[in-house]
């Protein structure tokens, strides 16, 4: 009886291990893929060139680079996608959510053309229609 119970427990554990391995991975920031809930910032127009993808608001782009490159994203963004279905994404010209702004509604994308190309230094999400805390 003890042996049968031991085999049953081992079988259940094996099945649990298989299902755990089949669970989808969570999105990872800056993995080079624009996943649900992320801000995806692109080096070039039309969502091309290097990509920086993140699940977090950033008060400063200083030191951040496009995935797989050494190119910093500060003042080098030409297009973006807001993959968060619920919150607006706000881009700021300066660090600490200051300066000119560009609001990107939940679930939308944009090209930063003309004077707004290569301008952004921080971003945050908010459910509000105007800006970030302290911005």
Residue ranges and their predicted role:
Residues 2-13, 18-135:
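Compact beta-sheet-dominated domain cores in extracellular/mature segments
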């Amino acid at each position: 009886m003890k042996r049968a119970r031991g085999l049953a427990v081992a079988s259940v554990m094996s099945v649990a291990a298989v299902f755990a391995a089949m669970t989808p991975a969570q999105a990872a920031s800056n993995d080079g893929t624009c996943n649900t809930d992320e801000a995806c910032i692109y080096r070039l127009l039309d969502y091309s060139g290097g990509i920086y993808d993140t699940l977090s608001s950033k008060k400063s782009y200083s030191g951040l680079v496009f995935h797989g490159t050494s190119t910093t994203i500060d003042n080098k963004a030409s297009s973006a996608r807001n993959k968060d279905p619920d919150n607006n994404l706000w881009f700021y010209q300066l660090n600490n959510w200051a300066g000119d702004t560009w609001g990107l509604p939940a679930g939308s994308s944009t090209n930063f053309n003309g004077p707004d190309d290569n301008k952004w230094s921080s971003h945050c999400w908010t459910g509000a229609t105007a800006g970030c805390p302290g911005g």
